[in-house]
Curated annotation (Swiss-Prot):
GO cellular component: HslUV protease complex
Alphabetic keyword roster: ATP-binding, Chaperone, Cytoplasm, Nucleotide-binding, Stress response
Source organism of the structure: Pseudomonas fluorescens (strain ATCC BAA-477 / NRRL B-23932 / Pf-5)
CDD domains with a match to the protein in the record: RecA-like_HslU
Gene Ontology MF annotations: ATP binding; ATP hydrolysis activity; peptidase activity; proteasome-activating activity
Name this protein carries in UniProt: ATP-dependent protease ATPase subunit HslU
Amino acid sequence: MSMTPREIVHELNRHIIGQDDAKRAVAIALRNRWRRMQLPAELRVEVTPKNILMIGPTGVGKTEIARRLAKLANAPFIKVEATKFTEVGYVGRDVESIIRDLADAAIKMFREQEMIRVRHRAEDAAEERILDALLPQARTGFNSDDAAPAQDSNTRQLFRKRLREGQLDDKEIEIEVAEAAGVDISAPPGMEEMTNQLQSLFANMGKGKRKNRKLKVKEALKLVRDEEASRLVNDEELKAKALEAVEQHGIVFIDEIDKVAKRGNAGGVDVSREGVQRDLLPLIEGCTVNTKLGMVKTDHILFIASGAFHLSKPSDLVPELQGRLPIRVELKALSPQDFERILSEPHASLTEQYRELLKTEGLNIEFLPEGIKRLAEIAWQVNEKTENIGARRLHTLLERLLEEVSFSAGDLASAHSEEPIRIDAAYVNSHLGELAQNEDLSRYIL
């Protein structure tokens, strides 16, 4: 990851509108990870990541910033809700499962990368196995005709050509494939580690078992290709890479951290609040967790926590946890202008998504600037009058706005083949204006 903070912010701007302070903070945190890896080994161990606390209302881009950041970094990433965890000793998930899930995400990520890397070799091997099934080897007999091998080779090349052109896709063959170890165990909360161990045990017991199956060539080719790719992937090497990636580049996003903060001066013991915070402390500070990859040290994993803090304040978190989240970033509520930009500027914006979806049925729609502006105003008004859910309000409004068009897209396509349906201010008002004005209706429908 050699992108500069400026380049990271530029890339985030393609997907997220506004929130420049938050983008700068995460860009610097990500760049510092690269800087740390350039240091001498003895100094590198001492440099720990500066964890981030994002504060802001729902739907302003907190989660999206973290998600896009992980894609940019090509690093193991996991998003969890703080409310899902309980204090150790109580029924529920313990916080160490966060690191176990991060390890699983890393294994999946690296396995997918390795499968892509060996794809061509796997395809060649799969092709040979399918051809072997289509053309069984002739038994050796007394006839030692020298022309036979050449004839076999010509036949094989002919079948190879037909296979690649898809002419044999529907032909049924019998082929030997690995038997899937189909053991799925569901466990009560808090017993995930034992479940993983049992699943690994049963999977190893079934390893190596093979059986003959009758399949169509197209299905068999995919199955055999995946099997050959798995065989070409070195599991030990993959685990070593995944372990290093988790420890040195892992990113954990903890959402709804405000829900485990003690609200004001409320008394009493609350299992789901202060206890969870105290369990998170060693994880964020640095400890060792047992996972599928072995022992994972959390010292250099970057933690990004976020919360709306409507009913509580960051100062309501236990002091030790506040100290472990030194970088504070406040995300601003969205304005009508922000909504307008969200609808039109980002890569794969909402209006572009709906336009392309309807185009698949031959129906063209066009969002005019005045229509987008009016839609943004209504979204802001409804958020102000009812519950402020940020940019998520746009999904609700667009679904309502285009409900009739989506339902009758096939019929409308022939009627509007020459020119598109134009979504202007009048169209938006006719479909949403009355609902937006009526507070009771907008509370339930929008």
